[in-house]
């Protein structure tokens, strides 16, 4: 026999060594696991072969299975379990184990993990990375786990069939990874703190059973993705904040159980759902479903109470007029605000935004303008044969203008301006006043003969060839218009000449000391009482300031193409030459002075520190101000104008008479205030949430405040709040998760990731909002050096308090008088504060969900009526006649818009209507 070669001996020796080492590693891991159990199973002894221990299976001396379910085990799971490289199945469910679930990363053979119903308090970061063979992950009912996020590393576990993570304290949004999990059939995530929308990738999955019900803060968005989930058998989405209609589920031929109760769903129950043969159980109660009461098959178990159906008899249709209006709402995605008002089977019985004839039978006006609606214009509007006026302006509508509208014989006015419509411009009869400008940049220019497409006026008749009489009328109208335009221009030139003469005669001011101020007319709303700059007078204030009879000549402004030029002395006069007595506050960006005009209107004038402005150029500064002056939100302090004088820059804001939230929380006794009631505190918190929500997600772009704190939350006479100090606002670029920036903000309110890396996302503001909530609850400052170290940092201390709910009453502001009902509200706010201050940004909710949590608490008290807030700005590129025309147009139409105080569940309800031409962005300020 030939002797083995040295190479063969080396390979054999290496193999034996590796096998021996692997077995030894398994022995070490199993002994560590035995020590971590208290006590271990009785036969788990170091003196016996671990492969013979109860619940352990081996193959070739390597551990492949650990099965210890229902053994009443205590202790924890040793991290050495991650070295069992041949492990295929772990079953340790229904025990009393605690500690952290260790990492199983890179155990490529692992197929099953069962750890349900234990007392684990955490999950190792990346615990499930690299588990390419994993089929089942079940951690249900471990609700002591510290808040964590859905493990996105599961994207590599393409063999997964089942994920059970219900009641495990998951927070944040779901990653959009489910199209990568082609084998996934069961996804159970109920009873967590998941927020955000259903990921679109669910539509490309093969999921059969989807349980995502009972999220603490509630998921939101539509459920449209269900229409693509053709493998669905069971879908539990109840107890969330989903909105919009039920999609077409006719392709889900195996769907037998659909739970949609307790959401904000709207619209008509689709007929395809009524005929779905597989359906056996459905819950629709406690939503806002509209239209006919659906008639399901007798075999289907249905709960459907507490909706807004037009009839009480199943299968009975609504009146034609109601069905038409619901079709119109359908084009807009069935907005919740319409569902709340459009109830019953008579559209003339108090439906909002609908006006009827004197007989109370036919709709003659439909006013859906200035609500930020999305969607398209439904051609069903043409079925409203008596309709005279249709307002759809100031929304975000897309698509085309239906040609059916041109055949409405009663129609006299249609306004679709300030939308994003496209396609051809329909040719309306000459009797119809048709407005489509400004906005609608993609809308065609082939309008009728009666108006220029550039003006968006009334269009002429089709073709414009109705006879010689029509042509003569057109010529006459054209001549009259030309004469009026000429006279307006002539008057403007004369006016400008006279004003320049007066300016030269009475204001011997060095041209270098003349500033420019851009003024916007901010109508005071319920949030600012009489403290707003406009003081409730609207355009009258503008006229008073510019009238020669308004007082001293130093108050006479020169209008030049929309800009208003004033001497620096005007601001000196209204602030008593920037007297120390007029100082309202100081900040890193300047000093704020109280100012009072001759008519008694109060303003706040911020004199910017030169050092704070840095090297910012004049053109950049003006570009920023041009944006800030054109937008409004009822919970953001309004910037009214600015003045530039050489290197000095001044900002003019509305005045907020009740100071800031910090004064009412921490200095109320010294300042002679009464302590805030719980009602006032929750209302203020909701106002702030709505303002910041608008910055983050409801404006055209996303903006980050970066310095949210009580001193930047200002209060009006009715104690409604507005967010101020936008000197630090950062634009969040589209498509980027975060922005690297120079550190700004205030210690105590800085999110951990921002303080550590300087990378900022909207979750930085969410963290600061959580700190403010804690201050509202406790009456304590975010940082208080007068307290012992363990209590000086509010977030750290309060999060310890939250571990035991019974400790919360002891931590509250002693001025609060809380009954049982109030305490329930306090617990909700305390819980929200904890979520907002989670250490990991992805575990924090967005501000929209803060609004949804706080809204129902405020709704109980019905706080001060939120009046309509119209906002008007003068664009720097707009001529005076154009500005005056805008004011006239707004004055004739705005009074009928935006009635009522809408439900907290509609984030759009926190957006006041804007003047036409204003972008959907944000307004900011640092004054009072």
UniProtKB/Swiss-Prot annotation:
Signal sequence, start to end: 1-24
Family statement drawn from the similarity comment of this UniProt entry: Belongs to the protein kinase superfamily. Ser/Thr protein kinase family.
Record topological domains on the Extracellular side: 25-472
CDD domains xref list: STKc_IRAK
Annotated SUPFAM superfamilies: L domain-like, Protein kinase-like (PK-like)
Protein EC: 2.7.11.1
Entry membrane topology: Single-pass membrane protein
Domain of life of the native organism: Eukaryota
Skewed-composition ranges (Polar residues): 898-911, 918-928
Identification of the protein by name: Receptor-like kinase TMK4
Source organism of this protein record: Arabidopsis thaliana (Mouse-ear cress)
Gene: TMK4
InterPro entries attached to this UniProt entry: Auxin_Ser/Thr_Kinase, Kinase-like_dom_sf, Leu-rich_rpt, Leu-rich_rpt_typical-subtyp, LRR_dom_sf, LRR_N_plant-typ, Prot_kinase_dom, Protein_kinase_ATP_BS
